C-alpha cells in the first residue's frame, strides 16, 4: 500500500462512519454570538465559560502589553523568553491556588504531555481514568511507563490497579471536570486511595479552573484536595489561551530541567501573560463571583427544560451539557437543524467519545442570557 492509498483508506473509513472531522471558518467564535458566512448564531459550542474573551479590561491589558513588550516573546524561557510579566503571572497563580510554584506552558496539551514525559520512567505506572483527555492518554501511551486505565470515576477499580506490584512509582491521572461529559471526578476519594499506595495524583482541571469553587479556584479547591500536580488552562474560564502546572518548588525545578515541551518551545508572548493577569483579577473579583452565579442559574434553567427530551442528559452540573444521541448521522443531522434555526451546536462523534455515544456537546457561558437558553430549549423540543 502506498502513502496515498494509506491516507485515502483512513479518510474513506472516517467518511463511511460519519466521523470525518471538518473545520468551519468563523468571523467570531467566542462569546454569546458566533458569526459565520455573514450570519449570526447563538453560540453553544464555545469554552469561553465566563464570557471573558471580549472583556474590555482584558483586551486593554493585552494591547498595553503588546505596546510595552512587543508581540512575541523572542525565544524559549530558558534563553530570553521569560519576562517579568511571566514571572508575575506564575507567582499570582501559585498564590491563588495555594502552591509553591507555577510554570507556564503554551497549551494544556503541551503541559500534560510535558509533565508525563518528564516524570514517568519504564519501571513506573500510570493509572488513568479511561475518559481522560486525549492529551493525557496519548502522553501516557507514548511514555515508557506502564499504562493502566480504570473505569470512569471508579475508585474501587483504581484501588485494584494500584494494589498490583509495581517496581517504580505510580501516578494517578484524571480530570477535575471531564471535557466530553461535563461530570466531575471524586477527587477526595481518588486522592485517598492514591496516598494509600504511595502514589502521586495529577489533575487536569481545564474545565473547572476559574468556573467553580471559591474565587473560581476550581475542582480541587472545591473538593479540598491538593494534588501533587495540578494543570490549569487559560482557554476556557480565563477566555485567553495557554496553561500552567502547579506544583512544589522541587518539582518545578525538576520540570525546568527535564520537561522538553517547556525547554524547547517559544514562550507565550508577554502581552498574553499580561492579559492573563487581568483575567485572573476579574476571576477573583466580585464580578467573577457574579459571572459564576449567572452561569449556574443558566445551567439550572437548561437542565430543567430538557428533562423530557428523548436523549440521554449527562450527569453534569458544569457548563458542559451533553445530550447523548447515540448514532453519528443522527447527531450530525440534529446539529445542522439547530444551526438552521440560529443555534450553533457541535456534534461530537467517535473516536473523540466512545462508540455509540455521539452527542450534541452544548456549552453554556456567562455571556448568555435567559432568553438564549429559552430559545435553545425551544429549538431542541422542536427537533427532539
Swiss-Prot record:
Source domain of life: Bacteria
Binding residue positions for substrate: 21, 133, 352
Pfam families in UniProt: Aminotran_1_2 (PF00155)
Annotated transmembrane regions: none
Cofactor(s), by name: pyridoxal 5'-phosphate
InterPro entries linked to this entry: Aminotrans_II_pyridoxalP_BS, Aminotransferase_I/II_large, AON_synthase_class-II, AONS_Archaea/Proteobacteria, AONS_Proteobacteria, PyrdxlP-dep_Trfase, PyrdxlP-dep_Trfase_major, PyrdxlP-dep_Trfase_small
Protein family according to the UniProt entry: Belongs to the class-II pyridoxal-phosphate-dependent aminotransferase family. BioF subfamily.
Name under which the protein is recorded: 8-amino-7-oxononanoate synthase
Source organism per UniProt: Escherichia coli (strain K12)
Amino acid at each position: 500500500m502506498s502513502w496515498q492509498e494509506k491516507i485515502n483508506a483512513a479518510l474513506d473509513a472516517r467518511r463511511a462512519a460519519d466521523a470525518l472531522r471538518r473545520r468551519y471558518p468563523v468571523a467570531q467564535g467566542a462569546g454569546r454570538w458566533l458569526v459565520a458566512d455573514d450570519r449570526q448564531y447563538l453560540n453553544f459550542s464555545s469554552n469561553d465559560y465566563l464570557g471573558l474573551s471580549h472583556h474590555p479590561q482584558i483586551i486593554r491589558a493585552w494591547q498595553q502589553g503588546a505596546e510595552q513588550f512587543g508581540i512575541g516573546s523572542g525565544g524559549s524561557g530558558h534563553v530570553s523568553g521569560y519576562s517579568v510579566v511571566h514571572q508575575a503571572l506564575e507567582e499570582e497563580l501559585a498564590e491563588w491556588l495555594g502552591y509553591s510554584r507555577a510554570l507556564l506552558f503554551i497549551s494544556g496539551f503541551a503541559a500534560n504531555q510535558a509533565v508525563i514525559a518528564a516524570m514517568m520512567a519504564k519501571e513506573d505506572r500510570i493509572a488513568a481514568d479511561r475518559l481522560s483527555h486525549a492529551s493525557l492518554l496519548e502522553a501516557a501511551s507514548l511514555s515508557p511507563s506502564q499504562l493502566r486505565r480504570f473505569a470512569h470515576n471508579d475508585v474501587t477499580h483504581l484501588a485494584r490497579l494500584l494494589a498490583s506490584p509495581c517496581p517504580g512509582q505510580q501516578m494517578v491521572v484524571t480530570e477535575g471536570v471531564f471535557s466530553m461529559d461535563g461530570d466531575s471526578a471524586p477527587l477526595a476519594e481518588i486522592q485517598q486511595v492514591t496516598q494509600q499506595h504511595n502514589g502521586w495524583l495529577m489533575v487536569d482541571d481545564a474545565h473547572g479552573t476559574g468556573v467553580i469553587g471559591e474565587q473560581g479556584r476550581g475542582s480541587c479547591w472545591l473538593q479540598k484536595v491538593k494534588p501533587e500536580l495540578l494543570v490549569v488552562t487559560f482557554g476556557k474560564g480565563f477566555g485567553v489561551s495557554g496553561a500552567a502546572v502547579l506544583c512544589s518548588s522541587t518539582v518545578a525545578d525538576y520540570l525546568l530541567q527535564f520537561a522538553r515541551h517547556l525547554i524547547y518551545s517559544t514562550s507565550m508572548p508577554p502581552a498574553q501573560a499580561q492579559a492573563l493577569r487581568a483575567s485572573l483579577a476579574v476571576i477573583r473579583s466580585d464580578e467573577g463571583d457574579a459571572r459564576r452565579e449567572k452561569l449556574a442559574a443558566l445551567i439550572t434553567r437548561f437542565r430543567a427544560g430538557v428533562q423530557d427530551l428523548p436523549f440521554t442528559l449527562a450527569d453534569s452540573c458544569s457548563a458542559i451539557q451533553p445530550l447523548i444521541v447515540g448514532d453519528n448521522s443522527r447527531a450530525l443531522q440534529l446539529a445542522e437543524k439547530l444551526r438552521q434555526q440560529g443555534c450553533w451546536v457541535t456534534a461530537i462523534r467517535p473516536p473523540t467519545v466512545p462508540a455509540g455515544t455521539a452527542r450534541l456537546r452544548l456549552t453554556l457561558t456567562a455571556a448568555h442570557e435567559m432568553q438564549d437558553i429559552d430559545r435553545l430549549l425551544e429549538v431542541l423540543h422542536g427537533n427532539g
